[in-house]
Amino acid sequence: MIQKMALDEFDSLGDKVIEGYQLTDNDLRTLLSLESKEGLERLYSAARKVRDHYFGNRVFLNCFIYFSTYCKNQCSFCYYNCRNEINRYRLTMEEIKETCKTLKGAGFHMVDLTMGEDPYYYEDPNRFVELVQIVKEELGLPIMISPGLMDNATLLKAREKGANFLALYQETYDTELYRKLRVGQSFDGRVNARRFAKQQGYCVEDGILTGVGNDIESTILSLRGMSTNDPDMVRVMTFLPQEGTPLEGFRDKSNLSELKIISVLRLMFPKRLIPASLDLEGIDGMVLRLNAGANIVTSILPPDSQLEGVANYDRDLEERDRDIKSVVRRLEIMGMKPARQADFEAVLGC
């Protein structure tokens, strides 16, 4: 247990994790309570040591294609919830093919096909399966799907047509908070979908939000909850209030920062993929997240893309700086580099 550990003893924490130590709940309370700059820097350093032990200076790159921003859900935190009166789009199959052409040879390890729970695809799930097949045939890369809570039959068909990874975020394992965030949606349904996907050979990603009313105990509950389906990727994202949503005016005063939780995730899941998203703070934010222990850059947009991200800190900026060339340039400055495709597929194992 590390609850009484002095600051200088944090330096050995990474070594303990590499040797097989598993954090206790009291350990998690100690780490999540850290506030001093020195304490946090030592936590980040321990997380980097663990990451570097398993992955070296290699980083994975994930292209994000948000192909439909229509959604039937009323998530209180999400800009794209069905009650928000915003401009939306749904790419045609031809537009998706054209997007794929811009990605060939660009250096991405995986393509993330994301949509809201769009009635167009939910009324005829074979449309979604066809989309997966087209992208697989065009690019031949591993495909992550983020379609919301699809039925098992559709998940199985998508797997057969080339989907490798299912991203389906719980947001929180605090059931009371969940009801406030994913309004009217089944808690168990999402857990069961990930479990089914894992059984069918998918890799799975789970994720939580922070800064949305979670405290240390509910965060521990969520961290433990993410372990239940043996996820291949674990994510935390900071809640960013979105215009036109029920939580537009919400402000959280906790000290449970995304960077702190990324480091804790690395210590809990030493061999897993942990994202450094561009969605909240762009390239500069990517650097901070990699320095906290992340090892895959997500929300990289296709070249010259006008597609949306999820939180879109840069929605109104002319220069979005979220392309793969910009990412690679910054990685090189950091002394890091894109991994080989074979490295990524070895990590996937699925």
UniProtKB/Swiss-Prot annotation:
Catalytic activity of the protein: L-lysine = (3R)-3-methyl-D-ornithine
Protein name per the record: 3-methylornithine synthase
An annotated Gene Ontology molecular function: intramolecular transferase activity
Positions with a binding annotation for S-adenosyl-L-methionine: 77, 171, 182, 190, 240, 242
Family: Belongs to the radical SAM superfamily. PylB family.
Pfam families assigned: Radical_SAM (PF04055)
Highest taxon, organism lineage: Archaea
Organism expressing this protein natively: Methanosarcina barkeri (strain Fusaro / DSM 804)
Keyword presence, Iron: yes
Top-rank EC class of the record's enzyme: isomerase
The protein's required cofactors: [4Fe-4S] cluster; S-adenosyl-L-methionine
Entry-linked PROSITE patterns: RADICAL_SAM
